[in-house]
């Protein structure tokens, strides 16, 4: 019978004719007959012949201008590009990756996931082998740790290059110095990396061991036994106590709660902080004792494992009853792993374990984000490698290719290898850690958490900011503001009138019920005693408030009084309902706001379980209602409903509420709903339409029969259930329209203004309706009051999108507002053109956006503009957008921590993003740019000195400095001053916040570009040449004097260059300068005996008598001054003649 339920609603002939007429207008071809597609609220699109519509759009009925660049044949250009050029650049990578992936898939041979039959308490009856219920987050094991870490390091070309260079020192013919000269820096980098990986791996092992070793009670024929979480199998009956983690995916069989339901916390699974109500299988809940689970013959048929945590299809069957009992299972009957039991004790049968659980299947490794600064440094490093090879070839060429020239070439590669600094990555990683620490310690943005420490510089390069609305720009704290009944509207200042109407209605009902028990219902009697006008308004208010307080998924929770117990008690009908200790639990803040409002006007929800609700009237009377059916809210239906029976009158009523777009076709004809929805949305209110329908007992029984059959179907269950429910959703009586306000967060307006002045374009992506999104955009000053707004009209086909894009193209300097459906059509046919037009707008608002669309918009901006994007949100629907962006920011809000946990940076309020970007982002980028260039300068200058030295001595491949000189130069002699640049800042934080225009300069990338790189190369060549030639000219009698003079001048030059670059001194910078100088001076004395005199090494120039003379000091000073003074003069003149922006502000 269930399979006979129609899957799709029948389309009217008029609708089909209108659709054909529309298609005929937009193309010369006739309408294409085809199968109907299930879409109740979307206009159908004849996609087949739309694909045939030419881009030139020259058919009759279209306007085509010469300036219309939408008509460019871009497809042909892209097709030509995918030729030999594509294969040489990227095609071979794609082909190799595809082949490797194919081979890996063949080797792994993943087991196909299938549906399963699980017998209660009988794991041995499982037909197939299921994975162990163990959690493993470790990347390596004991045997693969060292090979794995080494592979991760040496898969990068530069690290592999340093390994080859270091290994070459084992070849006698290529050896040019001590082994530790090359192996010490490489070993240090590897040691730091392996230590960090080992610590992280050990922490993962400890966490996995702790989770896998948790003990649970397993129910067996002989009683309860303790079992580890990792030993749980499919079919086991597991008992989970309150506040205990659920170890695997289970079907909920029994609970200690009388209501047959329990609450669970899912914040670790979906990030939502609201408790979820779960319902036990009625057949097993009704068993007298726990041990009776083994006295019945029952099984669960479960669908194959899948990722969707919000849906489940299955059946429960008891075979030993007559007739057999069949119950449908849905998401409300499941207990997913990694959730927490919040009330009572639950018993469930395990259906999925290990990697087949929903939590594990939804755990994916997010993409490894690489910052733009790292990519730029990689490009510069590749340029340095080319310079290294070119310089070595030049030296060999000038040498005349004498002897074994290839050996000399390799030796020159070794001598000049310091051009590519191996310490660059270590310095930058340590700098990123410092930036993250500064962000988290900033008292002006408390609660900030840095979860991805590799991309702090991205915060200083952003061009596009994509933000959610609810909970991000707004507080997600809902306040009931407006009730509209069609003819009268009640606002915040007239709520006392509603309260008076409700109180009068129930007092008259009570008096009439006590005075006369025959005739009409109490409500009708109450109405008949009132004047005609008053009766109509009072009746409508009463029905509206009653519908609001009955149609929801809210559960009142009563906390026991202090000093008794900490257990949470749930209200029962016969207990004393206290307003003091009652709180409401629901999956949406809107629901709670509505129920709290009904409480404020006198009608209070005091109790709710699976089958009943109790309401308390203003006089204290308790009204009972039986819940017959509940239809929860889904993102597809955009509405929820409930069927209840009034126990005092036995009347059955179907209540429903939802979004206006979903409810408009359902309710009876009216002339005010659409207009008032628009009015409320323009005020920034979130609207819900409330309706009802009275049912007879026969109508309900017929519906229940069809609904039960649909729920038992294992194929297309959701479609069949929707079809049955839709048969009930016809000609419903419109009761009221509610408006709930979500207030803006603190300082949203100045923050958005600051971001706009910083050159950041802001796009708001929200799932809310167009009017509400537009109103919030105006009230938050996302769109200034002087700017025009172009509302992209609804389009459903390629032709309509073409015409609307042409109309939009003629607009200038106006904000764009577009719905998700229109956006989908535009991206399908005119992706490049739409993005190009949208990027020219000062602001863009996308409403009715799905999470997938949000992520796609981020990806499109990255692909089409090449600029850095940032996404910020607070809910689970923002996670995909946050992970797709170059920089993701999560806000810990009312909707939980899922967005915060998935983001790269976590903040507590939207206004904190201003300081995060203007101060920390800007400083991080400028500091890393200076640090990277200084580290490269440090390698370039010593390589220049080596080149000069070799050229002077007949291009001999002999090292100028050896041993500890090279190691000390890259570490203790210069590392601290150079690294102290991470504390430098050009302007004070207050100045950066006051003048956000300073941020705009960073998007051009001038702090680290090929121009600045070439300037530093020229500086290095100049200084290296001066230091080396100066030492050669001024040395006296021995060669060791050349080494002593040049190396000492080199160290002083590096220290002075750091001092000349610093713009704001920090006391740690001063300490670093003097510490490095002190280390160098002290090493002259302590290492004198360690190196032999007479060798070209560190000890060779330790002629104490020479280095303590005035001659040595003035020669070193002269060379240092000549190498640094001209640069200082040029810098001074530049700041006077063409000062940068920060200098103008500082002055």
Swiss-Prot record:
Ranges of Polar residues composition bias in the record: 505-530
Reactions catalysed, as given in the entry: ATP + H2O + phospholipidSide 1 = ADP + phosphate + phospholipidSide 2
Known cofactor(s): Mg(2+)
Topology versus the membrane: Multi-pass membrane protein
EC number: 7.6.2.1
GO biological process terms on file: endocytosis; phospholipid translocation; retrograde vesicle-mediated transport, Golgi to endoplasmic reticulum
Presence of the UniProt keyword Transmembrane helix in the record: yes
CDD domains listed in its UniProt record: P-type_ATPase_APLT_Neo1-like
Binding site for Mg(2+): 468, 470, 874, 878
InterPro entries in the cross-refs: ATPase_P-typ_cyto_dom_N, ATPase_P-typ_P_site, ATPase_P-typ_TM_dom_sf, ATPase_P-typ_transduc_dom_A_sf, HAD-like_sf, HAD_sf, P-type_ATPase_IV, P-type_ATPase_N
Catalytic site: 468
A Pfam family annotated for this UniProt entry: PhoLip_ATPase_C
Region (Disordered), start-end ranges: 503-535
Record family assignment: Belongs to the cation transport ATPase (P-type) (TC 3.A.3) family. Type IV subfamily.
Protein name, entry field: Probable phospholipid-transporting ATPase IIB
The organism of origin for this protein: Homo sapiens
């Amino acid at each position: 019978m269930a399979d006979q339920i129609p899957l799709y609603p029948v389309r009217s002939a008029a609708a089909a004719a209108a659709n054909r007429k529309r298609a005929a207008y937009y193309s010369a071809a006739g309408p294409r007959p085809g199968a109907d597609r299930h879409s109740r609220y979307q206009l159908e699109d004849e996609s087949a012949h739309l694909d045939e519509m030419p881009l030139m759009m020259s058919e009759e009925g279209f306007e085509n201008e010469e300036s219309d660049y939408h008509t460019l044949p871009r497809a042909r250009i892209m097709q030509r590009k995918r030729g030999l050029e594509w294969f040489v650049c990227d095609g071979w990578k794609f082909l190799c990756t595809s082949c490797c992936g194919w081979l890996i898939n063949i080797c792994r041979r993943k087991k196909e996931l299938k549906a399963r039959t699980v017998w209660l308490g009988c794991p041995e009856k499982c037909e197939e082998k299921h994975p162990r219920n163990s959690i493993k987050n470790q990347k390596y094991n004991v045997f693969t740790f060292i090979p794995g870490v080494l592979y991760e390091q040496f898969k990068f070309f530069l690290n592999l290059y340093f390994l080859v260079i270091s290994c070459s020192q084992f070849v006698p013919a290529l050896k040019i110095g001590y082994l530790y000269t090359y192996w010490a820096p490489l070993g240090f980098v590897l040691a730091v990396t392996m230590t960090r990986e080992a610590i992280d791996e050990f922490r993962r092992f400890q966490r996995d061991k702790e989770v896998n070793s948790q003990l649970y009670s397993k129910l067996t024929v002989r009683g309860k036994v303790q079992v580890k979480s990792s030993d749980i199998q499919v079919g086991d009956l597991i008992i989970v106590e309150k506040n205990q983690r659920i170890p695997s995916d289970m079907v909920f069989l029994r609970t200690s709660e009388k209501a047959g339901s329990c609450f669970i916390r899912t914040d670790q699974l979906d990030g939502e902080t609201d408790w979820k109500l779960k319902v036990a299988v009625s057949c097993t809940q009704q068993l007298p004792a726990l041990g009776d689970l083994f006295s019945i013959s029952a099984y669960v048929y479960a669908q194959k494992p899948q990722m969707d945590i919000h849906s489940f299809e299955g059946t429960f069957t008891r075979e030993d009853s007559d007739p057999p009992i069949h119950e449908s299972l849905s998401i409300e009957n499941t207990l997913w792993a990694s959730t927490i039991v919040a009330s009572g004790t639950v018993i469930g049968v395990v259906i999925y374990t290990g990697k087949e659980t929903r939590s594990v299947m939804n755990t994916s490794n997010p993409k490894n984000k690489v910052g733009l600064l790292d990519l730029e440094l990689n490009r510069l490093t590749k340029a340095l490698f080319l310079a290294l090879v070119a310089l070595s070839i030049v030296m060999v060429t000038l040498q005349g290719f004498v002897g074994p020239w290839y050996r000399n070439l390799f030796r020159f590669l070794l001598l000049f290898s310091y051009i590519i600094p191996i310490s660059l990555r270590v310095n930058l990683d340590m700098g990123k850690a410092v930036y993250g620490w500064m962000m988290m310690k900033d008292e002006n943005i408390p609660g900030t958490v840095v979860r991805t420490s590799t991309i702090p510089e991205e915060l200083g390069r952003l061009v596009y900011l994509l933000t959610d609305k609810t909970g991000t720009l707004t507080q997600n704290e809902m306040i009931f503001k407006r009730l509209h009944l069609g003819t009268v509207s009640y606002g915040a200042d007239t709520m006392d009138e509603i309260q008076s109407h409700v109180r009068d209605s129930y007092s008259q009902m009570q008096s009439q019920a006590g005075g006369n028990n025959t005739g009409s219902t109490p409500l009708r009697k109450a109405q008949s005693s009132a004047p005609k006008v008053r009766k109509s308004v009072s009746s409508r208010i009463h029905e509206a408030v009653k519908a609001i307080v009955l149609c929801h998924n809210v559960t009142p929770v009563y906390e026991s009084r202090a000093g008794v117990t900490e257990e949470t008690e749930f209200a029962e009908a016969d207990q004393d309902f206290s307003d003091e200790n009652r709180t409401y639990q629901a999956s949406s803040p809107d629901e709670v706001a509505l129920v709290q409002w009904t409480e404020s006007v006198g009608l209070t929800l005091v109790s709710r379980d699976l089958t009943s609700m109790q309401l308390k009237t203003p006089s204290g009377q308790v009204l009972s209602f039986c819940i017959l059916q509940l239809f929860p809210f889904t993102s597809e239906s955009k509405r929820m409903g409930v069927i209840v029976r009034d126990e005092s009158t036995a009347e059955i009523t179907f209540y429903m509420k939802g979004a206006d777009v979903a409810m408009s076709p359902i309710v009876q004809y009216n002339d005010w709903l659409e207009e008032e929805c628009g009015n409320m949305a323009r005020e920034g209110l979130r609207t819900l339409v409330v309706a009802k329908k009275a049912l007879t007992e026969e109508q309900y029984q017929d519906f229940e029969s069809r609904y039960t059959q649909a729920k038992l179907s294992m194929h297309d269950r959701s479609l069949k259930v929707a079809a049955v429910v839709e048969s009930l959703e016809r000609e419903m009586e419109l009761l009221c329209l509610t408006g709930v306000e979500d207030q803006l967060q603190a300082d949203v307006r100045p923050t958005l203004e600051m971001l706009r002045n910083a050159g950041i374009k802001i796009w708001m992506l929200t799932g809310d309706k167009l009017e509400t999104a537009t109103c919030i955009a105006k009230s938050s000053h996302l769109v200034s009051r002087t700017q025009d707004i172009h509302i992209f009209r609804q389009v459903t086909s390629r032709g309509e999108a073409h015409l609307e894009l042409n109309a939009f193209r003629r607009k200038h300097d106006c904000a764009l507002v577009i719905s998700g459906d229109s956006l989908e059509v535009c991206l399908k046919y005119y992706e490049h053109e739409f993005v190009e037009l949208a990027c020219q707008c000062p602001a863009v608002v996308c409403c009715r956006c799905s999470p997938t669309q949000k992520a796609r918009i981020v990806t499109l901006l990255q692909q089409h503009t090449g600029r850095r994007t940032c996404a910020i949100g607070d809910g689970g629907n923002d996670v995909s957008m946050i992970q797709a962006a170059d920089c993701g920011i999560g806000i810990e809000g009312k909707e939980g921590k899922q967005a915060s946990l998935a983001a790269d940076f976590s903040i507590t309020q939207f206004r904190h993003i201003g300081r995060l970007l203007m101060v920390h982002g800007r400083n991080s980028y400028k500091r890393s740019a200076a640090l990277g260039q200084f580290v490269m300068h440090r390698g370039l200058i010593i390589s220049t000195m080596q080149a000069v030295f070799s050229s002077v001595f007949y291009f001999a491949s002999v090292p100028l400095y050896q041993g500890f000189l090279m190691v000390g130069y890259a570490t203790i002699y210069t590392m601290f001053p150079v690294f102290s640049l991470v504390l430098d800042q050009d302007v004070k934080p207050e100045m950066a916040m006051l003048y956000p225009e300073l941020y705009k300069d960073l998007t051009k990338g001038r702090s680290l570009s090929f121009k600045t790189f070439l300037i530093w190369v020229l500086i290095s060549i100049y200084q290296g040449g001066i230091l080396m030639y100066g030492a050669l000219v001024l040395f006296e009698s021995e060669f060791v004097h050349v080494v002593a003079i040049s190396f000492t001048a080199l160290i002083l030059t590096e220290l002075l260059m750091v001092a000349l670059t610093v713009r704001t001194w920090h006391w740690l910078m001063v300490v670093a300068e003097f510490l490095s100088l002190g280390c160098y001076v002290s090493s002259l004395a302590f290492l004198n005996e360690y190196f032999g005199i007479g060798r070209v090494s560190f000890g060779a120039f330790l002629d104490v008598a020479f280095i303590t003379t005035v001659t040595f000091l003035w020669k070193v000073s002269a060379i240092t001054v000549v190498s640094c003074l001209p640069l200082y003069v040029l810098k001074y003149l530049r700041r006077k003649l063409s000062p940068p922006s920060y200098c103008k502000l500082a002055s």
